[in-house]
Amino acid sequence: MRGTTMNKIDWNNLEYYDFIGFVGVAAFLIYALYFGTLWYVTYDYRIEMKDQMVEMYQQISDPIPPIKDDYGVKKRWLIYYIVGTREFERDLTSDEFDRYGKQLLSRGWKIDKKYTEIDRSRKSTTMLLSKGEFIFEITWWEDKKICRFHLIKEDWIYDKGF
């Protein structure tokens, strides 16, 4: 450029706002480099994990045969998880829901927690199960023909909080 002279940075007499600017730019570059590298390095692992979770979800049995099985693979930062809804021909009874928990126990799942909530005059029962690194949550509402499922894998990426 014509008429412009470039001055060297005087490191001995650096002003406060110039210093803050350098620190801010350096912090942003380190942040971008860290997460960009993490995303790139874990890409194949995350795709493999997603496929493994879909396979695990499809292998989970049903309390009674469903009319419709609607699920989707969701992503939050670097973690994939599955959210699904299965619709049945009729309402499930609490005995059928308990038998379903026992059926999952025989397939290697472990019931970590089971609780019932009443919210806005609707009663729901939730079972939280685990099998290895997988966490599976089932919610059933009384007088509704659906169950909601959540499946997530607790691995090293999940433990990091991503």
Predicted region positions:
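Short, Lys/Arg-enriched N-terminal segments with co-localized hydrophobic residues
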Residues: 1-5
